[in-house]
Amino acid sequence: MKRKWIIAAACACALIFAGCSSDTATENAPEAVEEITITNEENVPTSYDCIVVDGSPEGVTAAISAARNGLSTLLICQDEALGGLYTLGELNYIDVPESRDGTVLVEGIYKEFYDAVGGSGFDVTVAKNTFYEMVQAEDNITLRVQSKFVEPVLEDHAVTGVTVEEDGERVTYTAPVVIDATPDGDVCAAAGCDYTFAGEDIGERDREMGVTLVFRLSGVDWEKVSEFVQTPEDGESAAEGGVNGNLAWGYSTEGYAYEPEDDAMRLRGFNIARQANGDVLINALVIFDVDALDAESRAEGIARGQKELPRIVEYMNENCVGFEKAELVDTAEQLYVRETRHIRCEDTLTIDDVLENRSQEAAIAVSNYPVDVQATKTQTYGTVVGFPDQYEIGFGSLIPQNIDGLMIVGRAAGYTSMAAGSARIVPTGMACAQAAGVAARVALEDENIRVLRDLLASDADIAEIQQLLTEQGARLDHTETHEAVMDHWAYDGLKVIRSMGFADGGYDNDYRLDETVSGPRFANMMNTVVKKSGLALEPRIAVNEETNNEEMLTALAEKVAALDGSAAPADFAASVQFLQARNILDATLAENFADPSATADAASCYMLAARLYEYLLTLPGASAYEAIDRLS
């Protein structure tokens, strides 16, 4: 079914609405865009050149890329519509990767979609139809919807196909190349690929970033919202939010002030996107205690959110300008899940790769995004560890270790948990997915390639992948921007603590290295290091809010003595000698901490913490996590 006129008309409407006031938008609102119903063809082949599992944006991109490169391609969509997080999760607020000079870093198939839906803040139904039309335009794609992945077909540690369930019956499809585009790396996990979960690679397997349930409201006064988010509050020089066409953001004070009935839930600042009919989608409700790999837990999370929402909307009616007459319409079908599995791949993108804007030898994508670690149940606010200018992702991050015939694209690809805070966004996944489709062609054309990982050892094949990507609209130009903080004397120490997820540089990469630290921050830093070493955390290091070098070093020496079985030093001078003897204090740090009544700066504390980590790892029972940096 070809219905391109719907898309063109809807995109035009989206652009028109960007400049309308709320009253005008309501009066002139078009009828809701009609969603295309997708049905499966009967008697389709069971053998293909390439199988892509999942109808996510990354899955659609991988399938289109493979098809355009001449491969017969099967796209398995587990839902009734294409688009995954963008459509069924209704996360229509696209994070556009853009360098500091304003260059959009991801193009190619992603840009085709972006342009077709009218940019960020798209209408969800328009997006569903657009993804379908893009797939239907490719003669080499066979699409199966409501086709549930069951298990991979394995032969000699290689995936050669997948078994799915369609209409209650199991069907097996085969192909020499399978691309896992599921958000959680389900195919890889079922095939036996190694992976870490959440922050496991830095000792935080139980880290629970909240999931989000997007909800839809009618009756929102867009003109009042636009004026409010652009108006500074009393005593402030700038507004907390802003507006851009049919997008708005703000209401952080109001969001965080909401007291939920469900204590495993939180409202934060609002990301607001207006739809073609005048409704708005709100990304603000964060839900905890959801096992994102368990279907029942996800369903329960949605139900909990839906139960809380009438109360939230009533609160918004009373406290949020422009929402006085808002009414709840519905919620997204799926949750926005930020993190689950991280598949171990031949190459791993690290936090230093991201924040040092590094190049990669076999680069297949360039992107950026703040390293965004969202709130947890015990941490009210999310943090931004840093904001890169641009970094490359290597082809090896798409190739799982140990299992052949398989590539992984999306947030579960070969990234450390900290790097994934940046690389997890959908446009980055779409860039990698386009590369996977091209790589499938090159692998099948090269008679010397027995398994996909062999491509990594072939400079000629990598060069061909890069050339084809460029010819097909992808952007691979990259500048390895040098960050000022990299020249700081304490940068090596900062990197260690940053890789633990403790240092927050924010959007401007300012780690406040020259500022003195508070007592609680010093204690939290040192206790974090002890915890990451795997040694006994209790009793914890504790110092006063207004602390000084004497108190800090004495408390630290006492803890180290308890860990290595030594007698605790008697005073400040003895503590200095004690820490020097263990190389925790070197000459520079000894000088920086020399005045007992002064308080050392953050740079010195970061370096002290890094040196503490090195010492603790020499003790019996200590262990190092793979994604935590070490001092060179």
Predicted regions and their residues:
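Flavin (FAD/FMN)-binding glycine-rich loop and adjacent Rossmann-like elements that form
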Residues: 170-171, 175-177, 185-459, 463
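C-terminal motif of bacterial Sec signal peptides marking the signal peptidase cleavage site
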Residues: 16-19
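Terminal recognition/anchoring or ligand-binding modules at protein termini
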Residues: 23-26, 499-632
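Short, low-complexity, disordered segments immediately C-terminal to signal peptides
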Residues: 21-39
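Conserved beta-strand-loop-beta-strand element in the redox core of flavoprotein oxidoreductases
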Residues: 153-172
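Glycine-rich Rossmann-fold phosphate-binding loop(s) that bind the pyrophosphate
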Residues: 53-57
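Positively charged n-region of N-terminal signal peptides that target proteins for export
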Residues: 1-5, 10
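Conserved N-terminal/central alpha/beta ligand/cofactor-binding core
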Residues: 39-47, 65, 71-72, 77-151, ...
